Design a protein with these regions (language model features):
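Short, intrinsically disordered or compositionally biased N-terminal tails of bacterial proteins
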Residues: 1-16
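Short helix-boundary/capping micro-motifs
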Residues: 27-44
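Helix-turn-helix DNA-binding elements, focusing on the entry/boundary residues of the two helices
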Residues: 32-33, 51, 65
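Interdomain hinge and pocket-entrance segments immediately C-terminal to HTH DNA-binding domains
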Residues: 98-104
Length: 104
């Protein structure tokens, strides 16, 4: 079961949507804005805006944008690892709650 795109709020005040984490991972995996956009079924402009918004929210540059490609900064590599874990934890929790609800 795929969790809906809700906002995650960190105690320091930054807000990131679950969708933003998925978009970021797609960009980092594809290594290209246009390829990630194609895979996600959104426009490159949508991904570009999202990545800039996420960088502003976190206060760190995550991506190095080059002509036709993307590279992760050190902060981006750290975020990628945490984003994968966060999405995995959300999925596991969602599945566990769904199973528990069926048993009730």
């Amino acid at each position: 079961m795929r969790p809906q795109s809700k906002i995650l709020i960190h105690e320091k005040g930054w807000k990131v949507e679950i969708r933003d984490l998925r978009y970021f991972l797609s960009m980092s995996d594809a290594g290209s804005l246009s390829e990630a956009a194609k895979n996600l079924g959104v426009t490159p402009t949508t991904l570009s805006r999202q990545s800039h918004r996420m960088e502003r929210e976190l206060g760190a540059k995550l991506l190095i944008r080059k002509r036709g490609s993307l590279e992760l900064t050190l902060a981006g590599k750290i975020m990628r690892s945490h984003a994968r874990n966060i999405l995995n934890y959300i999925s596991v929790a969602s599945d566990a709650v769904s199973r528990a609800g069926k048993d009730a």
